[in-house]
Amino acid sequence: MKNSDTLTLTAEILRDLIRCPSVTPEEGGALTYLQKRSEAMGFKAERMIFSDENTPDVDNLYTRLGTDGPHLMFAGHTDVVPVGKESDWALGP
């Protein structure tokens, strides 16, 4: 893949993620998108919901590609804070 193709794909993924509804705790929009993208690349994806008595349920996505090493683990957040008043935005997502 050429550098220009990589940049185009990266911009496409970032654009799509920005458009996903993902305000805490409703981050399922971004997780659904990431699950579909990773499964299309051959990853096995699994969703797990963590819950606690006093907090909203939190959806998590785990993906795996193969079983042989070497292994790499990446952990990140897909949730964001509320956008505030959209009327204050010059451009929406």
Enumerate the predicted regions with their spans.
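Acidic/His- and Gly-rich active-site-bordering loop/insert found
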Residues: K2-P93
